[in-house]
Amino acid sequence: MSEFCQKYGYDIVVTSTWRKYPEWERCLRNAGLRSGIKIIGATSLPTKDRATEISDYLSNHPEIETYLVFDDDESLLKNKNDDTSELGTLFDEKGVHGDNLILCNKERGFGEEEYTMAVATHLSLKYRNANNVSTAPLASADAEGSIEATIELLYSVGELSTSLLQRSFKIGYGRAATIIDSLTEKDIVFVENKNGRIKYKPLLEYEEAKAKI
């Protein structure tokens, strides 16, 4: 996981919706334990308190340059009545740079199933410019590179699961197999179910089942 984060340039993941997304909570916790990634959880705090906790932490850790914020509250980034934001105002006050802040948020057009895709979109190097700022469209499930990055992330932290893949991807066997082959040395294959979604099976199990047909 540490190699993955170095590759994609992320030092920290900040999330305030872990309890709503248990699969990602487990994934992120495992990632933190295995790589030393700094993770902040502020699930139960009000918006202003969450913003304060995040900005305080980052102001005390200037070495952290890029961070993700998971939150369902749009006002954390932008208030309804003007262009200011809880985080933006506090960042200015505390001297925290916000150029690399990424907010993943339901109000921006995606639901629980697409959280995986949104993260992967932002982790893709294809959407990072010369200043190391993400230019990826938020929550674009079809964004080039997002599926590959998601699978790589899940595989790297040992969380490549049938349920996550079935919920996150609607792609055919050929595309999925091509992506996964480069990561798993062909020890996992993807098969498309009757609903058009995919699941994975160990290669040996798949070949044995296929031979019986």
Question: In which residue ranges do the predicted regions lie?
Answer:
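Short aromatic/hydrophobic-glycine micro-motifs
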Residues: 10, 33, 188-189
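Substrate-recognition element of Asp-dependent hydrolases with the DxDx(T/V) motif
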Residues: 5-26
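Short, internal active-site loops enriched in acidic
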Residues: 18-21, 74-75, 206
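Short catalytic helix/loop segments, enriched in acidic residues and glycine
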Residues: 1-3
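Terminal-proximal interaction/regulatory segments of ATP-powered molecular machines
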Residues: 136-213
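C-terminal cap/substrate-recognition subdomain and adjoining C-terminal extension
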Residues: 26-131
